[in-house]
Curated annotation (Swiss-Prot):
Keywords assigned by UniProt, alphabetized: DNA-binding, Transcription, Transcription regulation
Ribonucleoprotein found in the keyword field: no
The organism of origin for this protein: Haemophilus influenzae (strain ATCC 51907 / DSM 11121 / KW20 / Rd)
Protein's UniProt name: Uncharacterized HTH-type transcriptional regulator HI_1251
One Pfam assignment: HTH_3
Signal sequence segment: none
DNA-binding region (UniProt annotation): 24-43
Residues annotated as domain HTH cro/C1-type: 13-68
Length: 107
């Protein structure tokens, strides 16, 4: 389990891309062809990035969609690992491989 929350998509976007290029959120929105609120929500970590947004960000900043999606996935996993309700539910999940009758999984 990760102890420190991973750097967010918004932080990376702001510090590594927007600031060095002197871009504002409104500039990013125009470049991405999205509403300013959409760009603001991403930069301020109020919303997750979608597959479509990852592809757009990759094109704009000459990266890959996987770069952006991996950042988002790391945050999502960290959030789940630290979500008590989910962890309680997960404790009730049993591995299928420990079942006595494995014939239902045979091909």
């Amino acid at each position: 389990m990760m102890t420190r929350k991973p750097t967010s998509v918004g932080e990376i976007l702001q510090e590594e891309f927007l600031e060095p290029l002197s871009l504002k959120i409104s500039d990013l929105a125009q470049i991405l062809d999205v509403h300013r609120n959409t760009a603001s929500n991403i930069v301020n970590n109020s919303s997750r990035i979608t597959l479509e947004m990852a592809v757009k960000l990759a094109k704009v900043f000459d990266t890959t969609p996987e770069f952006w999606l991996n950042l988002q996935t790391r945050i999502d996993l960290w959030d789940l690992e630290h979500n008590k309700r989910f962890q309680q539910s997960l404790a009730n999940v049993k591995p299928a491989l420990h079942r006595h009758d494995t014939s239902t999984f045979a091909m």
